[in-house]
């Protein structure tokens, strides 16, 4: 084995000629992963009588029976990187055809290394970019990246879908966060290959906590599959929403009848996936009607009963730090099954299980590098805003402020049905007032659909990418400004993507087509420019009036 001197092409192979055998071309995957292809055959996009496209072959590989592809340290990340490069190239080609690019092509052509260096310094100083050409280039780079899965700009596009849902159905009714416990849940261990009898489950049998953690760390595919299985199961059983390719079926769930939902998937520092979801309920009064109804005691009592049934931050035993310390401490409580509804003392089992789970999953402990950050006054504060509001009883005011009973300020609220049945950390809030609804909707559109954490200067990365672009020109593109700028956009997007830090379970979600969003309905983009152009053609006086 020796290193080659030519770069490996990661674009689809060209079709073989009439006198060329498809299997004669060398295959990068067969040579780079001899442990995955021990016979030197069967690599991705290798010659075969029936062509198999790249994404489908990757999905097949990740589901291979011996799990060698999904447990490989680099195979998923390399295939995802190749997929991103191909999407970026197609996206750059689409961007070239936009009318906005036609208008700004010569402005972008005026970019120089000095302008990008100046933009880098401005970004480091926290100042806005002053050069118009650099701003135009960034707009096109971000627009190109928005069509590439896993990028920050692709997540930004989710915001318009959330706002369009609110435009059609009004403000959301519920805000819920679900954080399935992949380290200890027995279902995740089954996906990782453990033999566990769920019908005759015994917590003392099966893998111990060290082995369970190793199973999930070694198999990000199992972690991702478990997460999507759990969220789908919660939506279909507890929420009673069944989504098919042709329709959305909604029954009576724990929250009532759901009109629609929209949730975004995010990964934590150690790679665990969790969901932020907004829920719109059916037959909800308009914001104006709610404002008027909240003035009546009868309506406030109904809202109060709804909150007491579905959102809690207290059960007997969680009065203070001292009372919590007296409760049993079971770190492996998630390695269990929910109470059996057929047991004689089901209600008692539910209450005991809820207390044990709330003790382990819902008590917030502030720690540096987890939630404690420095504010602008150089003071350590909890970014989760603990301690939370304390209330002796659940409350609803005539202004719409509401909350559950909470006696200890470091208890996160929870949804009882999710806590007991999914046996994981969760949070929930019922939205009544306009202020709460606007704040939460803004949070989920700006935070839950936020960009991934980064520790790099975008302008600096673009400057390096531009320098590479100048050093490696394509002779065949010299006479075409469109081709030159398409190549520049592709290279800049690829330079930024190289700086991404994506967790293994999130990469598996993209490769398997599961994505990073749960939504009950589909969305179609509306290009408003087409409507305005049609209006100007039909009513020329509108154009003159605008001028």
Segments and roles (model prediction):
Residues 1-275, 279-547:
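Intrinsic low-complexity, intrinsically disordered terminal tails and linker regions enriched
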């Amino acid at each position: 084995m020796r290193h080659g001197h030519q770069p490996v092409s990661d674009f689809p192979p060209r079709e073989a000629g009439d006198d060329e055998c498809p299997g004669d071309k060398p295959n990068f995957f067969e040579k780079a992963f001899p442990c995955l292809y021990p016979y030197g055959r069967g690599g991705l996009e290798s010659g075969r009588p029936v062509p198999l496209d790249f994404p489908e072959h990757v999905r097949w590989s990740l589901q291979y029976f011996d799990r060698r592809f999904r447990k490989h340290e680099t195979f998923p990340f390399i295939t995802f990187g190749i997929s991103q490069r191909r999407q970026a190239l197609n996206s750059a080609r689409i961007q070239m055809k936009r009318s906005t690019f036609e208008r700004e092509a010569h402005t972008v052509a005026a970019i120089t290394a000095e302008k990008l260096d100046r933009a880098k310094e401005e970004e480091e100083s926290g100042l806005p970019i002053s050069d118009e050409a650099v701003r135009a280039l960034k707009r096109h780079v971000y627009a190109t990246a928005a069509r590439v899965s896993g990028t920050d700009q692709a997540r930004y596009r989710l915001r318009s879908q959330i706002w369009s849902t609110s435009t059609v159905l009004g403000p959301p009714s519920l805000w819920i966060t679900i954080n399935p416990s992949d380290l200890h849940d027995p279902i995740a261990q089954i996906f990782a290959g453990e033999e566990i009898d769920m019908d005759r489950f015994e917590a003392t049998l099966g893998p111990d906590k060290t082995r369970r953690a190793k199973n999930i760390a070694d198999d990000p595919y199992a972690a991702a599959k478990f997460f999507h299985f759990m969220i789908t199961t919660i939506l279909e059983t507890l929420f009673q929403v069944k989504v098919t390719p042709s329709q959305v079926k909604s029954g009576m769930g724990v929250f009532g009848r759901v009109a629609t939902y929209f949730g975004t998937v995010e990964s934590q520092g150690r790679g665990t996936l969790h969901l932020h979801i907004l829920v719109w309920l059916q037959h909800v009064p308009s914001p104006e009607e709610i404002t008027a109804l909240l003035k009546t005691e009868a309506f406030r009592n109904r809202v109060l009963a709804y909150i007491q049934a579905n959102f809690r931050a207290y059960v007997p035993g969680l009065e203070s730090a001292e009372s919590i310390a007296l409760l049993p401490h079971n770190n492996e409580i998630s390695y269990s099954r929910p109470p059996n509804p057929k047991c004689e003392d089901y209600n008692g089992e539910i209450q005991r299980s809820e207390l044990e789970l709330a003790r382990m999953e819902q008590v917030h402990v502030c720690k540096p590098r987890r939630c404690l950050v420095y504010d602008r006054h150089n003071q350590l504060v909890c970014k989760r805003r603990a301690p939370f509001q304390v209330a002796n009883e659940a409350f609803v005011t005539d202004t719409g402020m509401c909350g559950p009973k909470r006696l200890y300020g470091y208890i996160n609220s929870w949804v009882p049905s999710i806590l007991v049945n999914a046996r994981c950390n969760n949070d929930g809030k019922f939205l009544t007032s306009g202020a709460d609804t606007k704040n939460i909707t803004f949070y989920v559109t700006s935070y839950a659909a936020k960009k991934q954490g980064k520790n790099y200067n975008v302008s600096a990365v673009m400057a390096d990418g531009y320098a590479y672009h100048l050093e490696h020109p394509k002779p065949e593109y010299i006479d075409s400004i469109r081709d030159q700028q398409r190549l520049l956009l592709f290279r800049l997007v690829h330079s930024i993507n190289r700086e991404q830090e994506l967790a293994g379970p999130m990469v598996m979600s993209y490769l398997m087509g599961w994505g990073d969003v749960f939504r009950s309905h589909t969305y179609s983009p509306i290009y408003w420019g087409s409507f305005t152009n049609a209006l100007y053609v039909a009513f020329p006086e509108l154009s003159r009036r605008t001028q």
